[in-house]
Amino acid sequence: MLLSLENEVDPDARYLGDALRSLLGEHATYDYVREGGRPALDRFDDLDGVVVGGSTAGVYEADDHPWMAEEAAFVRELVDREIPVLGVCFGHQLVNEALGGRVEHHGLAHRLVTADLADDPLFDGVNRTIPAVHGDRVVDPGDGMAPIAATDDYRYFATRHRDAPVWTVQYHPEFQHDLLARIREDFGWTDTDRSWADVTTARTLRNFERLAAAHSR
């Protein structure tokens, strides 16, 4: 079973978290924005791993959102206990910052990009054409985190811990073509000559589920 951490501060943008969870198998949800603190891991039987979800907030806004520091502490606990973690978009940034990295605002990007993907099991079946919607970037990775994907202007598009079973991706695996109209309305969208037919990012979630389950055996 996976634990999904909900981090969205804007109720009108929570559809992305809903879309992500619709692609997961058995899972529970913990809403950090509304609950704060930390999940009691002993509440969750057969926990395989944790998915740290996205948010329209930035990790540098922790003074306005005290739950961010609490979640960062929880992430460090997960890393120390070697519980598998997947950080998605804001989660990518939070995990890296929690481990001593640095995140900066770079302006909103919204287009299909071509990524160079490392030979990593997280990317099994994931094509290089990836939808990107984000305004912030990891500019220095956290301690132990190494890049496993990059675009032409973003070196740390995805990262993996050298020792613990921790992966993070800047992209939203749940962002498929059926969400494009909503994303275009809410965030804008730049059309390119890349094709949505080549987008297979949802496989990232299935791969993480498989990796997390294998680790917990």
Q: What name fits each language-model region?
A:
Residues 155-217:
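C-terminal and late-domain segments of enzyme folds
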Residues 46, 65-72, 149-153:
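Charged helix-capping and loop-helix junction motifs
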Residues 18, 22, 93, 135-136:
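Active-site phosphate/pyrophosphate- and oxyanion-stabilizing loops and adjacent acidic/basic residues
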Residues 96-176:
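Pocket-forming structural segment of enzyme catalytic cores
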Residues 17-18, 64-67, 100-103, 145-146, ...:
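Short, glycine/charged-enriched secondary-structure capping and boundary segments
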Residues 53-120:
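Cysteine-nucleophile active-site neighborhood
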Residues 13-14, 61-62, 95-98, 142, ...:
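Short glycine-/acidic-enriched loop or helix-start segments at secondary-structure transitions
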Residues 1-67, 77-83, 189-217:
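N-terminal beta1-alpha1 cap of cysteine-dependent amidohydrolase-like domains
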